[in-house]
Amino acid sequence: MFGFGNILYVTLLLLNAVAILSEDRFLGRIGWSQSAALGFGDRQDTIKSRILHLIRAIRTVMTFPLIAINTIVIVYNLVLG
């Protein structure tokens, strides 16, 4: 019923959602913008700071792989339905 392919689709959709988050429009409203981040030397391993680092890492590292993976998934769905 809920197969491996569906899990991959959900993962891809969640990565896309994180990749397109706007820091000014969404994250800034809840106080999670770049300006609200910690300065140099202030290292706190709070859950909020870890989530912010994860969001920034996904947006930085996964941009081009997500473009390629999305293209492959679109072509796959067009060809095989």
UniProtKB/Swiss-Prot annotation:
Signal peptide: none annotated. Pfam families: Yos1. Keywords: Endoplasmic reticulum, ER-Golgi transport, Golgi apparatus, Membrane, Protein transport, Transmembrane, Transmembrane helix, Transport. It is found in: Endoplasmic reticulum membrane; Golgi apparatus membrane. It is a multi-pass membrane protein. The chain crosses the membrane at residues 1-21, 61-81. GO terms for biological process: endoplasmic reticulum to Golgi vesicle-mediated transport; intracellular protein transport. Coiled coil: none annotated. The keyword RNA-binding does not apply. GO terms for cellular component: COPII-coated ER to Golgi transport vesicle; endoplasmic reticulum; endoplasmic reticulum membrane; Golgi membrane. PANTHER family: IMMEDIATE EARLY RESPONSE 3-INTERACTING PROTEIN 1. Belongs to the YOS1 family. Component of the yip1-yif1 complex, composed of at least yif1, yip1 and yos1. Required for protein transport between endoplasmic reticulum and Golgi apparatus. This is Protein transport protein yos1. It comes from Schizosaccharomyces pombe (strain 972 / ATCC 24843). The lineage of its organism: Eukaryota, Fungi, Dikarya, Ascomycota, Taphrinomycotina. The gene is yos1.
